Amino acid sequence: MIKVTIPANYLLALQHLAPKKEVRYYLNGVAIIAKSGKISLVATDGKVMGCLSKTDYEGKDFSCILSNETLKSLSIFKGKEVDFVLHDGADGFVLKGIANGLVFDAIDGKFPDFERVLHGYNHAYNGQAAQLDIELLSKFTSVAKTLGNTKFAGNWRLLHNGASNSVGVYKSDATETGEWVWYGVIMPLRA
């Protein structure tokens, strides 16, 4: 049995970075990945990626992807601090919150190796500026607002790494408690 508690607004925030109708169907949602004592919530559309993770997970390793449809049913909790418990049941995964459990089948597919793409805070960035798509950057503002960080939603630290490498997108106060750590990247515009 898998049991992990996840704030609803974290899943809804990351949904802003997930595509709506991607041919690579396994990207159409938010991945929950537990590996080696760390649990990560990840979403990407191939141009932007965001991850909230924490390192005090003590359960078994697992991976599942919540579809956009499943996340849509959680939207009634937007703006509320509601924790859900994820169980691996006989009928699929079950999210249990204040209401009855939402039973869903995880998307059948393997989420890309996001750790290969995300840079840690200590990564050596070269500082060379890159041109960025303002619409893609605005997705991070939507993420911050959904996380409840409305006052400084547009304040993100961009760590440039040249015109052909991903740019780190960081916000040290992305979550109120600091229990979950934010990592993000955005790809620069191609000339």
Task: Spell out what each predicted region is.
Residues 1-191:
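DNA polymerase processivity clamps
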